[in-house]
Amino acid sequence: MANFISLKKNEDILDTIKKQQKIHSNQIVVYFRKTNLKNVRLAISISKKKFKLATQRNRIRRLIKAWFIAADIPIKSYDIVVLVKPSFIDGSFVLNCNNLKIILQRIINKEKR
C-alpha cells in the first residue's frame, strides 16, 4: 500500500471518527470509513499529553508510515485515522507491526461482508 495520502483536514478526521467504525488493540485504535477516492488517506494522531517529547511522537509517526508503505495489504478507498496509546512505546517494533497488520486484516474482512 505504497500510495497513501495524508488526511490533513480536521473536518475529514472528525467525520471519520464520528462514523464510529473502529478496531482497537492495546497499542492503537484505528478509525476507518469507506470513501469514493482511489487512494487510502491516512492520519496519525499522537497525544502531546501522553507523549511529551516531540522526538517520541515523530518516531512513532515515522514507524507507522514506514509500515504502511512496506505492507502489501490491498485496501483501497478508505480514510484511516490511527490513534496511538502510551503502551505503543513499550512494545517492540515487530509486535506493533503485527498489531497493525491484524487490525488492517479485520478492516479487509469487514469490507468483504
Swiss-Prot record:
It comes from the Bacteria. Keywords: Endonuclease, Hydrolase, Nuclease, RNA-binding, tRNA processing. Gene3D superfamilies: 3.30.230.10. One of its GO terms (biological process) is tRNA 5'-leader removal. GO terms for molecular function: 3'-tRNA processing endoribonuclease activity; ribonuclease P activity; tRNA binding. It is an enzyme of class 3 (hydrolase). GO terms for cellular component: ribonuclease P complex. Consists of a catalytic RNA component (M1 or rnpB) and a protein subunit. This is Ribonuclease P protein component.
